[in-house]
């Protein structure tokens, strides 16, 4: 995925923004265009249900019409039928989620999909290690077992054919009572072992210092879901007693746009889409 390659070359991270509706996506893209930032629109199959295929079709249109480089990515999917249909539907990337499997089975699942994906010019993201929605109740040993083991990275990537690697370094999905603490030394070790772009899931709860340190150690894509979903939902809810629908939607788009602008600023991707900016390659990505 050219957007990710460009981010790695310039030492920045691109936001991977999960969206649930075309209207929410429009607000996200408006912020990206205003900031001249490349962006990845992501769809989680479990989050949108039967709307997945029409949503992908609509997002493809929005992505292609954007004035900045925008990629379309299927997030967290372990179903081969769904993954193959997404590849045929015109996505730019798929995340083959074999994180519940042992390392060997995970690599075999990713490799099975990668054959079709690469033939279609689609990038493949894999996850080594496993993230949780919360760290509550984990023993130290259990938490350690979930983390990406640096010694497994090279063999896993060789066997799987993955183009991007999502790492588990203490990051968690969703909101947590206590901000997660990243194992930055583990991340640095992983980064020294591979040139494959690294991905960080669960980016919403991280403080700026940890985020900056992760990007400096090779993270090129950071997934953001919770804060964008919350902003859009708050925009929908914060209306008058008898609102006009168009006004409600406009407010929600503005709210998610503001949240996206903050994400772009934090990740350092503003201006990367323009010729003469930090990455000429990214301006030519699409």
Please identify what each model-predicted range represents:
Residues 119-122, 196, 241-244:
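Short acidic, glycine/proline-enriched helix-loop-strand junctions
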Residues 201-204, 224-225:
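Glycine-rich beta-strand-to-loop/alpha-helix junction loops that act as flexible
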Residues 1-10, 20-46, 55-69, 77-193, ...:
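Alpha/beta enzyme core
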Residues 236-286:
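Extended, intrinsically disordered, low-complexity segments
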